[in-house]
Amino acid sequence: MRFEEIVLPGVVLVNVGLEKDLEKPLEELSLLAKTAGYEVRAILTQHKEHPDKAYYIGTGKLLELKSVAEATESEVVIFDNELSGTQLNNLVQALLVASCVYA
């Protein structure tokens, strides 16, 4: 009998804000992603007072996120922040991921 390896779609979780511990709110989001059938492969945070109009995150963090998504072969990026339609579209185009969503 042969068992095939099941590879779950990879996801990167992102949180932006001014809170001291930006990873804590991502614990619940991580559980939700796992329940939905995703494997959380990375978590990124950014302390930022005002969101960038184009990407929500700054351009330096955008480059880091793209690098992490590529290195971990993650197809999905989930933000724990509310993004505009323009920001979502810009992120998908810049990151070359299957989808970018916010929770």
Regions picked out by a protein language model, each given a short descriptive name:
Residues 1-103:
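N-terminal accessory targeting/assembly segments
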